[in-house]
Amino acid sequence: MNILTPVADRLPSREEAEEALAVLRRWAKHTPVSDVAGLAPDVPALVYPEFSRSYPRNFTVDEAYKASLPDLQNGPASLIVGAKAVIQHVGISNFRLPIRYHTRDNGDLTLETSVTGTVSLEAEKKGINMSRIMRSFYAHAEQGFSFEVIERALEDYKRDLESFDARIQMRFSFPVKVPSLRSGLVGWQYYDIALELVDRGGVRKKIMHLDFVYSSTCPCSLELSEHARRERGQLATPHSQRSVARISVEVRPGKCLWFEDLIELARAAVPTETQVMVKREDEQAFAELNAANPIFVEDAARSFCQALQADPRIGDFRVVASHQESLHSHDAVSVLTEGPTFAAESLDPRLFASLYHTG
């Protein structure tokens, strides 16, 4: 007697299983993911394609392959997420590379530099290819940098990205040899400097930023200390503290302002710059220098202002000063601007916190 095995009870062959899996994958390819998962919980894992897990070291890219790569940032306006609004700045921040700078004494210094490059984005454009900013900048990176070289880099990426406004900012720590007050020792003082080139509405502005660190002795505390000594024979010392001024200046068209020039201008305005190399005679000299130049934060802002106003190479400017009090648990701060370039209704909430120089 012949016994027929029901089809449902027969174990499918490998070929039949492969055919069934191929059918399932064809169906899943054109079916919403939720429907695929709804068929059975383990179906998504079955239909997920197998991929190579080995890095293809010998794979090469030709022009046809590059042309096939998706480019979402240059996609149609229909891909824009959110409001179709103009973005004033979009780009990359803090890409670093060694840059060669020419100094006032005709030397060259290569310094690690942090670069920020941004462009404006029109309301109907999805995005930008940010790597073009780096590629444009790297094309000029071997040159000795100046505002003129920065302009050429900015022109390149503004053209490559088809943007109407653009900006480059370069931050670095600039070393200068500074002599001590009396001992004759010399040490390296490092100054945080940033160069900024802004192209907005077809108008270009060259801007330089300097953080100048100095000591501020409180004039009121100095007088109170002297009163205690004079009236009661009581030894007292005035409070003083490390202080920082962030000086931002617009360099007038056609003018040359060296880093060293701006540093010396700041030092002449407020001579109590913190010291590098110090022996006992230098420490005593610094105490005398502070006593001869007591200064409130208002005085500091106005002293820098007076020096900046007197330099014909400088247009608009801003002084942000912070006296990081040793008497109080708070700081004394001031902001002074001249001209429209730095005028602002609002201040960055972290502006004054960014002025701390911890050494």
UniProtKB/Swiss-Prot annotation:
Pfam families: GCHY-1
Superkingdom classification of source: Bacteria
Pathway where it operates: Cofactor biosynthesis; 7,8-dihydroneopterin triphosphate biosynthesis; 7,8-dihydroneopterin triphosphate from GTP: step 1/1
Function: Converts GTP to 7,8-dihydroneopterin triphosphate.
Molecular function terms, GO-annotated: GTP cyclohydrolase I activity
Family designation: Belongs to the GTP cyclohydrolase IV family.
Catalytic activities: GTP + H2O = 7,8-dihydroneopterin 3'-triphosphate + formate + H(+)
Keyword Cytoplasm in annotation: no
Broad enzyme group: hydrolase
Site note May be catalytically important, residues: 218
Gene3D superfamilies named in the record: Urate Oxidase (3.10.270.10)
GO biological process: tetrahydrofolate biosynthetic process
Claim: Metal-binding is one of the keywords in the record: no
PANTHER family linked to this entry: GTP CYCLOHYDROLASE MPTA
Keyword field: Hydrolase
Protein name: GTP cyclohydrolase FolE2
InterPro entries reported for this sequence: GTP_cyclohydrolase_FolE2 (IPR022838), GTP_cyclohydrolase_FolE2/MptA (IPR003801)
Its EC number(s): 3.5.4.16
